[in-house]
Amino acid sequence: MTQKEQGQGFIEVVCGPMFAGKTEALIQRSNQALQLNKKILSFKPQIDDRYSVKEEIVSHNQNTIPAILIDKSKDILPFITPEINVVIIDEAQFLDNDIVAIVDYLANCNIEVIISGLELDFCGKPFGPMPYLLAIADTVTKLTSICAISGKKANRTQRLIDGKPAQSNEPVVLVGGKEYHEPRCRKHHCLADIDKTKINWQNFTNQSK
């Protein structure tokens, strides 16, 4: 696709823990773009079937917008045509790293790209392609939720298994809502087998010194 002459592309990443309103923010952006008569395409990973298996993005508040289900990032490209002004992508943490090059390309073609995702997984590690998307974004909107323990701002997602903190060796991806996850602040986010008062080298780097 050749670069458009009108409009200016950009990448906005909306991130935060679960229950922070990320998807709701995407839906608001979509509605605003519709009011401006912009042509929009929305995508979400096929794996995200928490609230619907249909071709739609659904917020926790059950608000929806139509969406195309994709298995891999390159599935987006065949849908991009010259009249598209805005591309919306939900739950980007579940996508492969090709999404980084793809959204960079779309923005360079003067398409507005708005992405949401969890920047941290349940262990507090950078999640999937999200750190790279945050690095190349023109705008980052960091949302917070409310910690289920302290009632303070929450920027992490606590995984619970049978109501107790998960072990760090649990699978990274566990699709689900309140039955498995709740928002927590830094102080109250924990893993059953990790002592947070010690440096956890493997969480952030392969180097031990």
From Swiss-Prot:
An example Gene Ontology biological process: thymidine metabolic process
Subcellular location: Cytoplasm
Residues annotated as catalytic: 91
One of the Pfam families matching this protein, by short name: TK
Molecular function via GO: ATP binding; thymidine kinase activity
EC number(s) per entry: 2.7.1.21
Residues that coordinate or bind ATP: 16-23, 90-93
Gene3D superfamilies for this protein: 3.30.60.20, P-loop containing nucleotide triphosphate hydrolases (3.40.50.300)
Catalytic activity of the protein: thymidine + ATP = dTMP + ADP + H(+)
GO cellular component assignments: cytosol
SUPFAM superfamilies (alphabetical): Glucocorticoid receptor-like (DNA-binding domain), P-loop containing nucleoside triphosphate hydrolases
Keywords per UniProt: ATP-binding, Cytoplasm, DNA synthesis, Kinase, Nucleotide-binding, Transferase
Keyword Acyltransferase on entry: no
InterPro entries on file: P-loop_NTPase, Thymidine_kinase
KW Membrane (keyword) present: no
NCBIfam families the UniProt entry points to: PRK04296.1-1
Quaternary data: Homotetramer.
Family: Belongs to the thymidine kinase family.
Record PANTHER family: THYMIDINE KINASE, THYMIDINE KINASE, CYTOSOLIC
Descriptive protein name: Thymidine kinase
